[in-house]
């Protein structure tokens, strides 16, 4: 009986030894190499040449000729927008994402920010920094909260993350609207999929964006960045958005037109925003977002998961088993749609 040939797995990440050892133990056919790298030039040519599975965030070979054995790329990101136009986008190998690890922490982050905006947290933080107790009149006029119960939240991108946000928002008594590319289910199998239905949301399509926005007291952006979604929330969209709405963006900066958002905030049409993602990252020191009134800001951390290593091991191990058995992989990136 012929022994199956070994498959070389290369990680450019920084998983602990116990993680790598467990992957080896589960899949003895796998030859596991980890070389933490910031650029492809830090990986020796002989390693590239024998790599069959590449697990990486943003370190890719210069060309297909560098990786003649490559058969699959496992991304350490939920999105694939950073790959379009790169050397690997057109390679005839499957791309898989790490989607499914972050829906719960991201949904909890969104609810935290919805509550923070509703309870005027940006202004409250300003009061704390000023170090002076405001008068009752000032508190009444500037720190009066909104209620989430009975308000409407619109979620742009009603997939795994959006559905979990919708589920939690429903528990707060909010009416939930979801906007998604199609009313059907995306083809393929996905890691961590638990919400089989739309969690009671009223669904819209992108063609109905302005009607959707007109109903939103709160707008949450969770969709992937693609050619279709880039600049989707622009000046025209803010014009259609319900007066005084608040925005939370946990997706990608390029989906929301930052100039249009700034105009909306300063005019009062947008009553507040919570931003975890930006056009330019890292956000430069001195950028107006750091001190923009009415804005809560975090440095792209909404998707951080305390059990990231354990969840990633389960996803990667499942996909390795599928790959070795010739089965369909989880979280396949649809290149036609860009995610």
What are these language model-derived features?
Residues 1-99:
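An N-terminal-biased, well-structured beta-alpha scaffold segment characteristic
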Residues 93, 99-152:
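Phosphate-binding beta-alpha-beta segment of Rossmann-like dinucleotide-binding domains, i.e.
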Residues 107-126, 167-174, 314-327:
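Oxidoreductase and adenylate-handling cofactor-binding alpha/beta cores
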Residues 127-137, 328-339:
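A short, charged, Gly/Pro-tolerant segment at domain boundaries
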Residues 158-159:
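Glycine-rich Rossmann-fold phosphate-binding loop(s) that bind the pyrophosphate
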Residues 162-163:
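N-terminal Rossmann-fold NAD(P) dinucleotide-binding loop
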Residues 183-288:
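Rossmann-like adenosine-cofactor binding region
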Residues 283-284, 292-314:
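Adenosine-phosphate binding glycine-rich loop
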């Amino acid at each position: 009986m012929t022994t199956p040939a070994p498959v070389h797995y290369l990680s450019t990440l920084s998983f602990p030894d116990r993680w790598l050892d467990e992957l080896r133990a589960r899949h003895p056919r796998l030859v596991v190499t980890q070389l933490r790298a910031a650029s492809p030039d830090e990986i020796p040519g002989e390693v590239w040449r024998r790599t069959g599975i590449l697990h990486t965030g943003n370190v890719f070979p210069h060309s297909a000729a560098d990786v003649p054995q490559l058969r699959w790329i496992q991304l350490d990101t939920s999105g694939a927008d950073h790959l379009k136009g790169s050397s690997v986008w057109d390679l005839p190998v499957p791309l898989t994402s790490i989607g499914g690890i972050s829906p719960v922490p991201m949904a909890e982050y969104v609810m935290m920010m919805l509550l923070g905006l509703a309870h005027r947290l940006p202004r409250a933080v300003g009061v704390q920094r000023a170090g002076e107790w405001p008068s009752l009149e000032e508190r009444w006029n500037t720190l009066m909260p909104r209620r989430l119960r009975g308000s409407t939240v619109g979620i742009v991108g009603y997939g795994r993350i959006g559905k979990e946000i919708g589920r939690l928002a429903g528990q707060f008594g909010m009416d939930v609207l979801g906007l998604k590319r199609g009313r059907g289910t995306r083809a393929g199998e996905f890691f961590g999929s638990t919400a089989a239905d739309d969690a009671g949301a009223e669904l819209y399509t992108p063609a109905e964006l302005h009607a959707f926005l007109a109903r939103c007291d709160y707008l949450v952006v969770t969709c992937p960045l693609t050619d279709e979604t880039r600049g989707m929330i622009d000046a025209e969209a803010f014009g259609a958005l319900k007066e005084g709405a608040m925005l939370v963006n946990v997706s990608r900066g390029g989906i929301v037109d930052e100039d249009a958002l700034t105009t909306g905030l300063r005019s009062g049409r947008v009553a507040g925003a919570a931003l975890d993602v930006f056009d330019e990252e890292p956000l430069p020191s001195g950028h107006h977002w750091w001190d923009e009134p009415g804005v809560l800001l975090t440095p792209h951390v909404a998707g951080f998961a305390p059990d990231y290593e354990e969840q990633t091991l389960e996803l990667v191990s499942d996909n390795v088993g599928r790959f070795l058995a010739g089965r369909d992989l989880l979280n396949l990136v649809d290149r036609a749609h860009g995610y």
